[in-house]
Amino acid sequence: QDLKFSANFKLPFKNGNKLKFGAKVVRKTKDKAVDFYEYSPLDEDAFMENSLKNTVDQSNKHFMPNSKYQTGIYASKEYTGALDLNNPALFEKEQVQEELAGNFEARETVSSGYVRFDSKITDRIELMSGLRIENTNLAYTGRTYDADEDITGKTERQRNSYINFLPSLLVKWNVNDDFKVRGSFTQTLSRPKYSALVPSVNIKRSDNEITIGNPELKPTTSYNFDLSADYYFRSIGLVSAGIFYKKIDDFIVDQVSTNYEYQGNVYTRFTQPKNTGNANLLGVELSYQRDFGFIAPALKCIGFYGTYTYTHSRVEDFNFEGRENEEGLSMPGSPAHTANASLYFEKAGLNIRVSYNFASDFIDEMGESTFYDRYYDKVNYMDANASYTFGKKIKTTFYAEANNLLNQPL
């Protein structure tokens, strides 16, 4: 449930200058309350006999893996849908405690105010400057779960609050009607996920593993510097190049430790999200978009869009027990190379598009040493979609799509 209240004001001045200011309050209530039950037939022999009489072959020869994966025989949906699971004369019902471990109650209130001034320095130079202040208040309740003893309990309510000042400065230089240069400095904020903040404790004693939440997580903040140049073609399209730098503080990573002591017990595997350190990112981005009408007018219905981004990242002040002195680490979740490309055809209501996406490998999860780090492999995705719209008074659209044409493992 989200409740939002906001007020915005604008004061115009001479020469096109404007002052904008306002306030906003957002209160979010997010509860996860899942009840999961297992049903066991009281007469297993009769249940098995009836199930085997109501089966259907779910194999589909048009399924992409073909003979590599055959679904096989399953109970029919008509049979399973008609089962009277809540009839105590037929089934025994038991709640699954493990599913309750993921339940939580979360309350988040963000109160913010901003002021922004838009000014025209000259006929070709525009300046936008502003400041946003956000006050965040959090309250979370999670669950504790002991997998071997099948016990679920409720944690104490955890609270946290913080204030952030987020300045911004943007400059746009209209060199001419077709060429524009932009520069900006901003400070941004990224709050932790609900699932990371919940003070939950999940223990699996048979494997001697424990996973806990972290209600003391700080938000990740970033100072951002961007400079870009865009050239717009007289026909539809543009080519642009940009450079960016980000100074990121308190980024969050799932830290995994082995033989870790927690509340008097030593666990073979201990997992918890933590603010792991700071990082510097430097990168360049190139993009191009244009239809092929400049080659021949008949090709105006065909176009291309592509972007490429290179990012170089380095971690500083690494806050991981046993790895504080490591150097040369890349920021988790930050691939060095990403690319997107799309070839499209648009004419007379027919739209066809083929898209390609690439991301190089990157660190996904960090362990107590490089040996335990987990990497996400490089990925190549290709998708295609087509639609056709016809009709004047009543428009009708047919749409089709095909995903993961390169059969990239997910």
Write out the residue ranges for each language-model feature.
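Short loop/turn motifs that connect adjacent beta-strands in outer-membrane beta-barrel proteins
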Residues: K10-L19, V34, D123-R124, D178, ...
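Transmembrane beta-strands of outer-membrane beta-barrel pores
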Residues: A23-D31, I133-A139, F185-R191, S200, ...
